[in-house]
Amino acid sequence: MLRLGSHVSMSGKKMLLGASEEAASYGSNTFMIYTGAPQNTRRKPIEELNIEAGLEHMKAHDMADIVVHAPYIINIGNSVKPETFELGVNFLQSEIERTRALGAKQIVLHPGAHVGEGADKGIKQIIQGLNEALIHDQDVQIALETMAGKGSECGRTFEEIAQIIDGVTHNELLSVTFDTCHTHDAGYDIVNDFDGVLNEFDKIIGVDRLKVLHINDSKNECGAHKDRHANIGFGHIGFDALHYIVHHPQLADVPKILETPYVGEDKASKKAPYKWEIAMLRNGEFDPDLLNKIQNS
């Protein structure tokens, strides 16, 4: 079954219930959340996440295979500042616990940045961090995200992701998030040869590890190493390529999550595009006037 949704907010008193309600309003049947603000460590206790009511709403609205995203502040690739590395390991462990409590099986993680020390050193540090953070009996997988190669990001090639996986002792607890914008920006031609790219992924990593898809268009050309998301069909990847990926038979059971930008001139008037983009990806017809329609809705 096609599981298609977006990033939604989990906040206020409603927490998980609010996230599921927002997802349902977009016509989603899955969604992705952060368990708190992605840029800091402040977190509500698990008891305040309103999990029971959230799970009930999800069941009633056929929501499944939800995904958690780890916060950006985790950088287990940092070999320069031990305190940053330690914070990353400890915080990742607590986020895994929260993911499990929410009933999710996948927590998406940006592998890490080597902060100028070189990819080999960064990857070695990431492996060490994952070996420390992973608890053998956990049923949550860390879904390492394919990165665009901006700055000193590790995980910009399938080989780098494979290197991390191969170095981790309990790597059955690792999976991969394939981000269309990042992979395109990293230099993979998903527009003209997605099957070839998927084949390469399968040879190097194994397609059975691909557990989450981030569906985003890109504001930049292939190989730009920028990572700037565009609305579906309004970037350099284009609607046809993204529709092909969303409906790809080999990826039928993988949840597909949109992280496209809100539409509008200023912060106050910006609107979530997900209801429209999800409908468009489901029905297979691109609407070139979509952004105007969203703004005027």
UniProtKB/Swiss-Prot annotation:
What biological processes does GO assign it?
Answer: base-excision repair
Quote the Gene3D superfamilies the UniProt record gives. Answer: Divalent-metal-dependent TIM barrel enzymes
> Does the keyword Zinc belong to this entry?
yes
Binding-site positions, Zn(2+) 1: 69, 110, 145
Q: Which residues cross the membrane?
A: none
Free-text remark on how the cofactor is bound: Binds 3 Zn(2+) ions.
Q: What class of enzyme is it?
A: hydrolase
Q: Which GO MF terms are attached to this record?
A: deoxyribonuclease IV (phage-T4-induced) activity; DNA binding; DNA-(apurinic or apyrimidinic site) endonuclease activity; phosphoric diester hydrolase activity; zinc ion binding
| Superkingdom, taxonomy of origin | Bacteria
Q: Keywords in alphabetical order, please.
A: DNA damage, DNA repair, Endonuclease, Hydrolase, Metal-binding, Nuclease, Zinc
Needed co-factor(s): Zn(2+)
Q: Write down the InterPro entries for this protein, in alphabetical order.
A: AP_endonuc_2, AP_endonuc_F2_Zn_BS, Xyl_isomerase-like_sf, Xyl_isomerase-like_TIM-brl
KW ATP-binding (keyword) present: no
Q: What is its EC number?
A: 3.1.21.2
Q: What's this protein's family per the entry?
A: Belongs to the AP endonuclease 2 family.
- Name the NCBIfam families for this protein: nfo, PRK01060.1-1
Summarize the protein's role. Answer: Endonuclease IV plays a role in DNA repair. It cleaves phosphodiester bonds at apurinic or apyrimidinic (AP) sites, generating a 3'-hydroxyl group and a 5'-terminal sugar phosphate.
Protein's name in the database: Probable endonuclease 4
